[in-house]
Amino acid sequence: MNRYFFKSSHPFVSSSYYVLMLLIVMSTTNPIVISICFLASVSLRLLQMANNKKSGLLYPMVLVLLLTLTNPFFVHRGGTILFFFLNKPITQEALIYGFFSGLMIASVIYLFQAFQASVDSEQFFYLFGKRLPKLTLILTMIFRFIPLFQQYYRELNQVQKTLQRTQQRSFKEKAAYGLDLFGNLFSWALENAMDTADSMKARGYGVTKRSSRISYPWRIQDTAALLLLIGCSGAFFRALTKGYYQYNFYPYTESFTLLWQNHGWNYVLIIIVAFIPIVKRIKEGIIWAILKSRI
């Protein structure tokens, strides 16, 4: 059973989902929309990392906490004053705005992580390699850079620990070790990029149109999923232009309950789009359990 959801779907369908989700979460400051997208993106990452360490999920949450705590010290708008700091009002509205801004950024980070796990380089080349070969190569290298950088950092740090270079006590020696480690990582990144570029140039990449070595057949399920994505997201953007998702944090925050009561069906559209992979995962889990029970 595939835990990466869209791996069994056509690459165009999976890419369309992530593009639409990014457009939805970044197109409005509506707290309900942001919360739905955040829950969906976190659920995606949790299920993708089912058997792996989940420490990577904490970093975006730290960013949410930082934005929540720091925004009131820079933005003093709002009518509900909690207290004064250096004769500046710290307002509840600024606190809430910082929290949902952090959720928006965290959702974007989780979606990019889920996209990287669901759409591999082969699928990315299949979609865009024929028309934009050079840009596709650059984007693929960018997507691979951070995971490779982290992997090489762990390997290099482990070697230094074996050589007991991390046992220095003075601050000067620790700083020298950190600079040396960063220099090695930077040199490796440049060398790796040059080797990749030279290798692709030697193979004639980008000179003529290239075909993909893997074929991805289009199925009826792909058509149904794409129509559902386009239909629900199209209805969302149409409602967005009419102001149905407008929300004001200042001078006073509006009631979330009132938002849902007035435009509840519009938020159902977001739930359908956001949780399509989760529903697909549950469906596959049920089918897998039934098949196992028949063995």
Name every feature range the model reports, one short phrase each.
Residues 2-46, 159-295:
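Transmembrane alpha-helix interface motif
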Residues 9, 49-50, 131:
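Short coil/turn helix-boundary motifs
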Residues 35, 50-58:
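Interfacial helix-loop-helix linkers and transmembrane-helix boundary segments
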Residues 39-50, 63-68:
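Alpha-helical transmembrane segments and their membrane-interface exit regions
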Residues 56-172, 286-295:
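Juxtamembrane/interface alpha-helical elements of multi-pass membrane proteins
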